[in-house]
Structure formats: structure tokens, C-alpha cells
């Protein structure tokens, strides 16, 4: 990484940047090799960071005053991304057992969906409780989203920090994901490069990606 940055800096041209198709190709290849996610470059949208993706998703998939489901305790910008866009956080708190292992409260999630929420923010793997959600857990959540026609936005930035015997499962590999899943990821955590300001939105649903891109273009994300 350092060598590549030095080589780029020596180019001595620091004008405006534009999307390079090689970036998306490299990203898609990495996710295929490391996480078994089959995604094409045209099914991605480059972003400055994952939090930007959350904010754009709030605007793309809901209207002012709508509620978005989140599962506290969760990374602070989840709630902030909802509130700053004049949406309402609809909490479905995680529950823990006697050993301190956290699980999703599906009854609470469904109650919020029944009440009208049409978007769910998922942290996968979860920050801060360090849960790598199983395929069964994620599929059960997605099935709820499908039943209530809600969009599932999955923050997967910590995908590379899952160790044996646990396994990371991307929401993009679930049955039915092409109907309502948008995933967000970045190299910033894995390679300690948040200053490079590059993340990726991914979806097998062209309409979801187009809606996110439209909000990004309106917000000046280029």
C-alpha cells in the first residue's frame, strides 16, 4: 500500500479524481475470493465511507418522518445517520444470555416492521458486541424484511475480522437477497486506510443501487 501511494504521488498531477473501473473490479475480486460473494462491478457504487452509505440509504429508501430499525447497542453513526436525515430510529435492542452472548430479538424487529418501518440497518459483523451472525440468523432477518417489503442495509465493514471457528456470512449470499439487500463495505478497517476515503455499496438489485446513486449524485458524492 505504501509503495503504491508513493508511486501515485510521484505522478505529480493532483487534479480531480473520477471513478476508475479497476477499483470496482479489484473490490469485487477480493470479495469473491475472501467471502464467496459474486458481485459485478456494475452492481457497485463507490462512496467516501460506509457512514456516507448509511446516510444515503436513509434518504433513498425512506421519507422524512419514517422509522428505520436498528439494533442497539450499535455503532453510534447508525443512529446519527437516521436522525440527521429527519427519520426516526426504531430500536429493536439485542438480547444477551447468561454468558453474555448477544442475539437478535426477532419479535421486536417484527413489531417495528408491523408498525411501519420499511428499512433495517444491520451491523454484520456487529460492532460493538462482536457477533458474527450465522447464516440461519441472517436468513431469518431477511425473511422478515421480505415479508414486510423492507430494505435490509448491511454494514459489512468488519467482515475480515472474523476468526475460526466463526465464519462471516454476507447478506449478499442469502436466499432472496436480490429483492431487498444493499451491503456496504470498505478496506479501511482491514488495511488501516480510512484516510483514503473509499468504500463500496453493493447490491444484486439494480433499483436499490440506482436509488442510492441518485441520492449520492444529489449530495455531491462523485
Predicted features and spans:
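Short acidic capping loops at alpha-helix termini that bridge into adjacent secondary structure
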Residues: 39-44, 64-67, 178-181
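Aromatic/hydrophobic pocket-lining residues that form π-stacking "cages" and hydrophobic walls in ligand
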Residues: 78, 141, 171
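N-terminal small-domain helix-loop-helix segment of the aminotransferase-like
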Residues: 1-49, 56, 108
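PLP-dependent aminotransferase class I/II
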Residues: 180-222
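Active-site phosphate-binding strand-loop segment of PLP-dependent enzymes
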Residues: 96-164
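PLP-dependent aminotransferase-like
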Residues: 59-122, 135
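A short helix->loop->beta-strand "cap" motif at the edges of active sites that frequently abuts
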Residues: 66, 87, 147-151, 177-179
Amino acid at each position: 500500500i505504501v509503495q503504491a501511494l508513493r508511486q501515485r504521488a510521484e505522478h505529480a498531477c493532483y487534479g480531480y479524481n473520477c471513478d476508475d473501473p479497476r477499483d470496482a473490479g479489484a473490490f469485487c475480486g477480493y470479495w469473491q475470493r475472501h467471502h464467496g460473494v459474486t458481485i459485478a462491478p456494475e452492481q457497485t457504487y463507490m462512496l467516501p465511507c460506509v457512514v456516507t452509505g448509511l446516510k444515503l440509504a436513509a434518504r433513498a429508501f425512506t421519507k422524512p418522518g419514517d422509522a428505520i430499525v436498528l439494533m442497539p447497542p450499535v455503532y453510534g453513526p447508525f443512529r446519527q445517520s437516521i436522525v440527521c436525515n429527519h427519520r426516526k430510529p426504531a430500536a429493536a435492542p439485542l438480547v444477551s444470555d447468561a454468558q453474555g452472548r448477544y442475539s437478535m430479538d426477532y419479535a421486536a424487529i417484527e413489531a417495528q416492521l408491523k408498525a411501519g418501518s420499511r428499512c433495517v440497518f444491520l451491523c454484520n459483523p456487529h460492532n460493538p458486541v462482536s457477533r458474527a451472525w450465522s447464516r440461519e440468523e441472517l436468513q431469518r432477518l431477511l425473511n422478515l424484511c421480505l415479508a414486510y417489503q423492507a430494505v435490509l442495509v448491511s454494514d459489512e465493514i468488519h467482515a475480515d475480522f472474523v476468526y475460526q471457528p466463526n465464519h462471516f456470512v454476507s447478506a449478499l449470499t442469502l436466499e432472496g437477497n436480490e429483492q431487498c439487500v444493499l451491503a456496504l463495505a470498505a478496506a479501511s478497517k482491514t488495511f488501516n486506510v480510512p484516510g483514503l476515503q473509499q468504500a463500496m455499496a453493493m447490491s444484486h438489485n439494480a433499483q436499490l443501487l440506482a436509488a442510492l446513486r441518485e441520492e449520492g449524485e444529489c449530495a455531491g458524492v462523485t
